[in-house]
Swiss-Prot record:
GO terms for cellular component: mitochondrial matrix. The keyword Transport does not apply. The lineage of its organism: Eukaryota, Fungi, Dikarya, Ascomycota, Pezizomycotina. Zn(2+) binds at H557, H561, H564. The active site is at E558. It is found in: Mitochondrion matrix. Belongs to the peptidase M3 family. The keyword ATP-binding does not apply. Keywords: Hydrolase, Metal-binding, Metalloprotease, Mitochondrion, Protease, Transit peptide, Zinc. This is Mitochondrial intermediate peptidase. Coiled coil: none annotated. Residues 1-37 form a transit peptide.
Amino acid sequence: MIRTVTRPRQWQRWVYSSCLLQRAVPPAAARQQPRFTTSHKANHFGYHQPIAPVTHAPITREDDFVLRSVFDYPQFWQDFTSVPGGIPVGLFRNSFLKEPRGMLTFAYVSLKKARAVVAKVLAASSVTEYRLIVRDLDRLSDILCRVLDMADFVRVTHPDPEIQQNASKAWESVYEYMNELNTMTGLHDQLATAMANPDVTVVWSEEEKTVAEVLKLDFTKSAVSLPQKYRDRFVQLSSEISAVGSAFVQEMAPEQETVVLPSSDLRGMDPVRARDLTRRGKVYLPTLSGEAVMALRTVHDADARKHIFYASRTASRRSVQMLEYLMRLRSELASLSGFESYGHLALRDRMMAKSPEAVDQFLRALVESNRPKAMQEMAELLAEKQKAYPQTNSLDPWDKDYYSDIIRRPLRVAGRQGDLLSSYFSLGVPLVGETWHPDVRRLDVVSDTDGHVAVLYCDLFTRPNKSPNPAHFTLRCSREIFASEMEEVWEQTQQSNQKSMFGSPELAATDGMTFSRHGDSIKQLPTIALVCDFPQPSKHGDQPALLSFLQLETLFHEMGHAIHSVLARTSFQTVAGTRCATDLAELPSTLMEFFAADAAVLGQFARHHETNEPLPYRMVAQKARQTRRFEALDTENQIVTAMFDQALHSPRAGEPGFDPTAIFHALQRTHSCAPPDPPGTSWPGFFGHLSGYGSVYYSYLFDRVLAQRVWDVVFKAGERRAALSRENGEKLKQSLLKWGGARDPWKCLAEALDDDRLAEGGEEAMALVGSWGSTKPR
């Protein structure tokens, strides 16, 4: 019933024209380090009082200059925040988070609130009370997710170990209670009673009805309707699946930890890297390492590459056994819940595909549309091999990376200027917003029509012990809070020792965090965090943080998720922001990668950090051509992997003799143009995505196809500056992005793409999407 927002990449004018402070006509002189001061105070705990957000968004040259400089130059930021003033507040403005144990207090108070809501739902008996059940259950979910989502973020990103530890404890206590609720028959029965009464449902909005169906499905997946002993087994299985999945990823290992070869066999590899691995004339190459990947691309000796390939594609027997055990556990869980397979269980809820059969239609159509290009690329690789071996008529599995690297090499040389792209992408240029502190820059997102609409925290720079993986975290979803709830929370506050924490019912109902007013109700604003690992700007202030083109794409990708969270400000948090169909969640972020490479978009911000010269677009075009080389073969590999994921979560997982490795090899032979893995290898033991993305791996491909289609249809593939058209952006916003999970995603797509064939979804629609293909023309 209750779930956290999971997503284990700068605003564009088409989203909010006012959120992008557009560059005025650039001055001829180079950019200089600015000096600017304003009122701001930071305290020792890292929490701060930002300057008051504006309710409008003027687009001025001075604002553009200031906002870029806040990110580009450390000295500017020190001046910007050095003037005393303001009252220290909690982290994210949460009034509980003013000291290290604050997260524990927040969890305790939230659990108390949650229990009160549970009691209210269980006691409902009148039509009036039943009419409020969906809103009450959504509020219950929000109370718990406020803690879970925030604690999850803090425990993996905050630099203070004590705060991390307390966040972990808070998360564990609330997560345990959430699992109790998900199998609570009373809540399920009360919801079912409400949904079955026409006098109740007649007053529900369409969004409310959607939320009710989502909650009902969540209860069904938790086996809440089963007898007690089966519910107990369900909880036991769920716990074991979680533990085995984590162990599978953490303990993943190759059968052979190190490949030992004579140093003479590694001709072609970077001699410095090879020398570092050499002892007494032998090279000791770690099997799962960057050096092994490099060797497969560069070592001339085919036998040496063969040894490395076998080792890097053969997981340990224990890893494979853990995979098999995980699949059997999931199969049992699905059977216990009344589903034919785990795939049927996983795809029924919050998925566009709805069934394994529909996914199969998509993947089969996609592999067919991709095959001609993949075969062409294989022919190019074979022709390259035949230059050295004229008599050969086939490629070995360890040839693909080697010969594709040879073909790419001239592109890399021609695009050597691509290494200079970072000179045009300083971090302060793409981002817009208001304030920050040393670890987190706080940005207020302001709309020219709706005022203050979201809060965005950017933790973008590298630091010791920080995760290198880019991520988007939803710390709090949008939700509408009515006067009756505010009065209730305010009364509870007055009766407790929290009386002095909040100055109004609105602040008490939002834990002191940011909200917007809508008549008699308020909306808690989406609060989002973006985490990256970009290089720091120069401490001397002479050079801003410079991004490679890949890092720029990453930033745009993660901001795509943030855009979705900002636009989908629904009344119910259950369907807010990225809480949409799982196989739609990557569409906005993947789409943003097209904007990152668009000439008109780059022209808005990409200038040399020293000379202020605009970016020569040919440099980006060269980089894009290099990246897309052999794209079809890469896509084919992902298709086969997605098919493998579906097969693992099919009824076959519960059959005797279930053999994941044999299934994988058979799929390669049937659907791949590339040579299949040889017998004796066991790559499935390395398929770590199975832990968190079981049965939904196809989503990456699905959203890539959809993103390409949206770019081509809605934004006219960027022709005639269509990427900067507000009209185009408004269409995507109104048809798809603003709904979150509150509307049938197929109807959203049909409206966005002006294609009625998609409106009803199903297997035919999935096959149609697959037929569009996912590779871009070169």
